[in-house]
Each structure stands twice: as C-alpha cells, then as structure tokens.
Amino acid sequence: EGQPFMTTSCCPSYIQLVKKHIPEMEKYVSTTLSPMRYTAEIAKEKYPDCKTVFIGPCIAKRKEAEYSENVDFVMTFEELGSILDGMEINLEQVAPFQIDKEAYLSSHGYGSTGGVTKAVVEHLGGPEVNALLLSNLNKKNIGLLRAYAKSGKCPNQFIEVMACENGCISGPVTRIDKATAAKVYTKELAKMATQREQK
C-alpha cells in the first residue's frame, strides 16, 4: 500500500532473481503467496495427515517448496508423464474432470501471460489495471526491472512477471512445445467456461 507500483509474487524464479540480484525490488513485490502454497495450506487444514504433491511445468517450484511446511513433494509434468507412460495409462481414455464452479474462472488462466493480471482485475471488480506483462526473464527485461527498482518509478502500476516466455505453460519441464501448449491451454479454458455456463 502506498507504493508507486507492485509486481506479482507467484513465479519462484522471479522471486529468486529478486533475492539474489535485484534486492531493491523486494519492497515492490506482492506479499501474496503462490497458488501452490495456498492450496497446500488448505489441504493440510482439511486433511492434517495428508501428503501434498504439486505437479507442474516448473523446476523452480522445488525451491519454493522449501519455504513451505505444507508442500511435501514437487513433481514435474515430465516426471508424471514418464510414470503414466511406464504404467501404460492413456489420459485420453480417462473420464473428464469437473471444474469447481465456485472458483474464479480467470484463476484457471494463471499459467499464461496476462492470466494473473486478469484474475486480479476480476477479483477486485474495479477498473482495468495499468499493467506491464513481462513473461521472459531475458537481459532486457531484467534490466528494465532493475531500473524500476533502483529509481522507484515505473509507468505501470502493476508488473506481472513470469520467467518463462508465454508464462508457465512454456515451463522447462512440459512435454509439448510452446505453440501446442498455448493451443491446448486456450482450448481447455474455453471448455471450462462452457462447463460453468451449463451449471
């Protein structure tokens, strides 16, 4: 509150970048935990003896899990895919899942560029946010973040930062290429929206 701008906090690679290389940015980073940590916290409250496993396209989640007593294991899509292949399980033949109709539909879009910003705007129910979307922690974008942190000034009030180009859907341990991932993701979000309308 009262800061000239704020950045997202859900990408663990970005958080490590700030801690190690741009400490001046730390005060501008949201204190909101990532969905992985909130979900694990809820699971442990509801089922105290359970073991929680985060499955995703991100290796950096392993580092983030070290900061949470609620996340027991982290598995990548590549690892899960290898297990499914080894057990000869074909996901195309598995019954489709039903989405939680109480959840914000936009929260399912977190994994792609602009998804976090959209979810924030929907949750607040206010006007559009003047956001900068940085979904590639290359030299240019790191330099930009460093400049904003050191000057304390940014033309945008909100910066959504994701280490991977196009967001988490292009994470380093997915099993499909970026273009296919984006198509599948968009298709699944549309399917979820249709399911919501039918409820």
Residue ranges and their predicted role:
Residues 1-199:
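Iron-sulfur-associated redox domains of electron-transfer enzymes in respiratory
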